[in-house]
Every structure is written in structure tokens, then in C-alpha cells.
Regions:
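C-terminal motif of bacterial Sec signal peptides marking the signal peptidase cleavage site
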Residues: 18-21
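Hydrophobic helical h-region of N-terminal Sec-dependent signal peptides
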Residues: 11-16
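Carbohydrate-active catalytic/glycan-binding domains of CAZyme proteins
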Residues: 51-303
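Bacterial signal peptide processing site
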Residues: 23-25
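Small/flexible residues
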Residues: 27-28, 174
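Bacterial N-terminal signal peptides that target proteins for export
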Residues: 1-10
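Post-signal peptide N-terminal segment of mature Sec-exported envelope proteins
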Residues: 30-65
């Protein structure tokens, strides 16, 4: 199945990272689980569960499944009837909390990146999004079976950051013949950073050593929170970056003109135009930019 940029955009716009639930039973690929406190990781086939752990239909109990998920174990299959809580099903990740997805296609696979909300649940850490400094990445070649490639430790790659939220990614083949990936992220609410790689799962480098966008940057006087980047590359290979955020009250304003867009330089690490305001009705945050069949699509959140 060929995955197109249209599918990537649809995937990002859909309920991609919903409330954690259990994946379909059977031979599904979920990737590697997170290591436990001892540094080990593994999977569990709950078809070997004892009779006391199954209900009358021969299906492993919901309590057993959720207990396994909470302990960081991936369930490969379920005995008896297939268990699936359709109201709380995450089609990509049954045990890793994620948010703010962005996607890119490469070599027949779709790579999806998200904010690593799992950090909020880790023992011994401050359970607050204000301390998130990593992203996560998954991939698929059929939109059904997913591989978890682990974390992108942005805080180690770029030690100057405050946070890494809400990524947006773009790629293109450059003069060296390699595909280069540009992964933009929110540096908290204060700006936008970017890391780069020639492989969709890294290793990643910090080419600037500082933010690409920051508060009080010339041209951003009415953009109080220049975060939530949205990047795309058009048919001419030109990159564009949108971003911006206001306050919840701005979501009640028809013409705040808070979000901005600018043409990126050839290096994708600088700007080649002035910032232009986007007149997005009732804009609040969560900019995203897609270029599909000659049309630019700008999506955002109003609340």
C-alpha cells in the first residue's frame, strides 16, 4: 500500500492519539516496550494466562490487560474472543502516552512523531507537561501494524531548550543525494527549535544551537506565544513555517491575526521573508501546515 502525503495529513487530523486502550488481538506489531526500572523490556503473550484471569467467554479480563499495560508490557495476542474496548482504543500505541502528532512518508513507511506525554507518568519525575523534553516516533507500512522506535531525547541533543512539544516534520532530497529531515518543535511557549537528521529515526543533531523563533523577535510584536510550528515544503522545494499562540480569550476573537507564516531559507534553518499574519478566525493555538495537490492547508485550534 502506498502511503501518500494526503494520508499523512488525514492521519494527523484524525483522532490519532486517543485515550489509551488495548490494540486488536492477533498477530499485531507493536514495537519494543519501554524498559522497566531494571533496564529490561519485553512482551507478554496473555494467551497463557491462568483460568482465574479469564472471564466466562474465555477472554482475558480487562483488569489483567490494563495491569499489563500499566507495567509497560505489550500484549501480543489475547486468547478466546478478541478483546477491544472500542471507546478507548488507540490504534498506534496501547501503552505509550503521546500527543500532537506530525507525520512524514519515507521509503514506503509513514513515520509519526509526537510529544512524549509518557514523561508525565514516570516515577520520580515532576508530573507536568512543563518538564517534557523528549519526543516519540512510530512507523508503519500498512496503517495497521506499528513499530515504536523509542524516544528522541531533544533535551540531550539541544541542552538549551526548555521543552519539546508539538513537533512538525518535513523532508526533501538535497544536493548530496540524501533525504534530509527537519523536525521543528515548540520550545515551551517561548519559541520554536529544530533538529535535523538524514534518517527518520535519527541520530538527530542541533544545527543552530539556539531557537529558530523566539519571543520578542522583530515582526512578532502581536504574537505572545510563538510556538506550535507547522512546516511544509511545496512542489518547488521551498519550505514554509507557520506558528503562533495566544490566550484562551483569543479563541473568542474573530480577527486576532496572531498566527504567522514565513518562507524558510534554502537551508530550512533561517527565514527568507518577513513574517506575515494569518487571519485565522477565532485562533488560539496548534498551528499545522500541509501542502496537498497545489493547495496549502492551515489547521489550528480555537479552544
Amino acid at each position: 500500500m502506498k502511503i501518500t502525503s494526503k494520508l499523512a495529513a488525514i492521519l494527523c487530523a484524525a483522532a490519532l492519539f486517543m485515550t489509551v486502550g488495548c490494540s486488536n488481538g492477533g498477530e499485531t506489531s507493536s514495537g519494543s516496550s519501554e524498559p522497566d526500572a531494571s533496564g529490561s523490556s519485553g512482551t507478554a503473550d496473555v494467551s497463557s494466562a491462568s483460568d482465574s484471569e479469564t472471564n466466562e467467554s474465555g477472554t482475558v479480563s480487562e483488569e489483567k490487560i490494563m495491569d499489563s499495560l500499566n507495567n509497560g508490557i505489550i500484549i501480543d495476542s489475547v486468547s478466546g474472543n478478541v478483546y477491544k474496548n472500542e471507546m478507548n482504543a488507540n490504534p498506534i500505541s496501547p501503552n505509550i502516552f503521546c500527543a500532537d502528532p506530525t507525520a512524514v512518508e519515507y521509503d514506503g513507511r509513514l513515520y509519526v512523531y509526537g510529544t512524549n506525554d509518557q514523561q508525565q507518568a514516570e516515577e520520580g519525575t515532576k508530573n507536568d507537561y512543563a518538564y517534557i523534553k523528549s519526543l516519540v516516533v512510530f512507523s508503519t507500512d500498512d496503517m495497521v501494524n506499528w513499530i515504536y522506535h523509542g524516544r528522541i531525547e531533544v533535551g540531550e541533543i539541544a541542552p538549551w531548550i526548555n521543552n519539546s512539544w508539538a513537533p512538525s516534520i518535513a523532508s526533501r532530497v538535497e544536493d548530496d543525494g540524501l533525504t534530509h529531515f527537519y523536525l521543528y518543535f515548540s520550545n515551551g511557549g517561548a519559541g520554536v527549535g529544530v533538529i535535523t537528521s538524514t534518517d527518520p529515526v535519527g541520530p538527530w543533531t542541533d544545527p543552530l544551537g539556539e531557537p529558530l523563533v523566539y519571543q520578542n523577535m522583530p515582526g512578532l510584536e502581536n504574537c505572545p506565544a510563538p510556538f506550535d510550528p507547522g512546516v511544509c515544503i511545496d512542489e518547488n522545494g521551498v519550505g514554509w513555517l507557520s506558528f503562533g499562540g495566544g490566550t484562551p480569550a483569543d479563541g473568542n476573537t474573530m480577527h486576532s491575526k496572531i498566527p504567522k507564516i514565513a518562507k524558510l531559507g534554502k537551508d530550512m534553518l533561517s527565514f527568507d521573508s518577513e513574517f506575515v499574519s494569518i487571519d485565522a478566525p477565532y485562533f488560539f493555538e496548534a498551528s499545522e501546515l500541509n501542502y496537498i495537490d497545489g493547495v496549502y492547508y492551515y489547521t489550528y485550534c480555537t479552544d
